């Protein structure tokens, strides 16, 4: 079974309070999602491999450490996942960015892929899938499967807010994919919104309804 990591750093919890607040406008909401994503990225990447590296300082030589493992890839789930990409990529400029979009077929209720553009060397990369919310788990589950179908193997899922139902669904479908979130809330309501949640992240990020 995959691990669930709840990142409860005080700075993250402070910013999450205002992300949840319905009075927070779109501009501030975007900024807060950016900031929280950057803070979360420190934890999500904590176990990246490093190797010893010697540099010349202005005074002498120093033995330091640099990244040495697999290259990284970021895969936001459209559209809300776009709000998390910039800050994470600022920390990891060499990371390649793919995009994946899914929608639910109104008749079959099954996830359908409508867009997918991933790095060609996806099988050589450690991948972080980004989406602010993990509600039912349907989009995350399907997106990760589409990524696996194209050769992705080393995958982590990063969200800001999750419902227990979504966590359970994702863990059941992909027990090899660890989940990072800032909060696991009470439940989903009858409309599949997280309670208390933060509303529709895509609408709040981009000012749409």
Curated annotation (Swiss-Prot):
Describe which pathway this protein belongs to, using the record's wording: Pyrimidine metabolism; UMP biosynthesis via salvage pathway; UMP from uracil: step 1/1
Q: Which InterPro entries match?
A: PRibTrfase_dom (IPR000836), PRTase-like (IPR029057), Upp_B (IPR034332), UPRTase/APRTase (IPR050054), Ura_phspho_trans (IPR005765)
Q: Which domain of life is it from?
A: Bacteria
Regulation of protein activity: Allosterically activated by GTP.
The record describes how the cofactor is bound as: Binds 1 Mg(2+) ion per subunit. The magnesium is bound as Mg-PRPP.
Residues that hold uracil according to the record: 194, 199-201
Pfam families, per the entry: UPRTase
Provide the alphabetized UniProt keywords. Answer: Allosteric enzyme, Glycosyltransferase, GTP-binding, Magnesium, Nucleotide-binding, Transferase
Residues engaged in binding 5-phospho-alpha-D-ribose 1-diphosphate: 79, 104, 131-139, 200
Q: Which GO terms describe its molecular function?
A: GTP binding; magnesium ion binding; uracil phosphoribosyltransferase activity
* CDD domains per record: PRTases_typeI
Per the record, the coiled-coil ranges are: none
Instruction: Report the NCBIfam families cross-referenced here.
Output: PRK00129.1 (NF001097), upp (TIGR01091)
**HAMAP family per UniProt:** Upp_B (MF_01218_B)
Q: Specify the protein name.
A: Uracil phosphoribosyltransferase
* Taxonomic source organism: Natranaerobius thermophilus (strain ATCC BAA-1301 / DSM 18059 / JW/NM-WN-LF)
Q: What is the lineage of its organism?
A: Bacteria, Bacillati, Bacillota, Clostridia, Natranaerobiales
Coding gene?
A: upp
